[in-house]
Design a protein with these regions (language model features):
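Short alpha-helical segments enriched in small residues
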Residues: 2, 6-197
Length: 197
């Protein structure tokens, strides 16, 4: 009984953090993908490849991670991931719509089973009243029937909330809205941790 209670406490998000024993979030992602025989990919903007870097830092990650893309500019979001002009024009690069299209595009580009995308305003400049510094959208996409992750995302930070869920063809997409604070590096680090959760 005691061990079960301790395990539950250690695996519950507390103040935006996860606690575990003898592992990291990145390693847990790779191990779980290996167990399930799934391939994962990333599409990143404000994190500039940090999520892909975190995954590939895990030995054996090549069994589940074929690659990811960094699409910092709108032009690259369109060219590499197929984000639509009208999406960027009507909603902007930092929006749930763009995050969702980035994740869909990453699956189409790589053939992966699961994709996570991250787009946001890491700061210190660039924020507005409507879209302040620290605003980040994270999309999780999976081919239908592959996993329940997008349908039941882990809200790994107190500011995280589901803001969109849709299906496109055979792919389910869930988008989280997060509002982080602190330094540029902290925003980027929390974005990666939230994307991998």
């Amino acid at each position: 009984k005691c061990a079960k209670a301790i395990d539950q406490i250690l695996h519950t998000p507390v103040s935006g953090y996860f606690y575990g024993i003898n592992t990291t979030l990145e390693k847990a992602v790779v191990i779980e993908a290996c167990k399930l025989g799934l391939h994962i990919t990333t599409a990143e903007s404000c994190t500039g490849g940090l999520a892909a870097g975190a995954i590939t830092a895990v030995p054996g990650s090549s069994a589940v991670f074929d690659g990811g893309v960094v699409t910092y500019s709108n032009d690259m979001k369109k060219k590499l991931l197929g984000v639509r002009d009208e999406t960027l024009r009507d909603f902007g690069a930092v929006s749930p719509e763009t995050a969702g299209e980035m994740a869909l595009g990453a699956i189409k580009l790589t053939g992966a089973d699961i994709a996570v995308s991250v787009t946001g305003i890491a700061g210190p400049g660039g924020g507005t009243e409507e879209k302040p510094v620290g605003l980040v959208y994270i999309a999780a996409a999976s081919k239908a029937g592959v996993t329940d992750h997008p349908s039941h995302p882990v809200l790994c930070h107190p500011s995280a909330s589901v803001c969109s869920h849709f299906t496109s063809g055979d792919t389910d997409v869930t988008v989280l809205r997060c509002q982080f604070s602190d330094s540029r590096e902290r925003v980027r680090t929390l974005s990666v941790k939230s994307a991998l959760a």
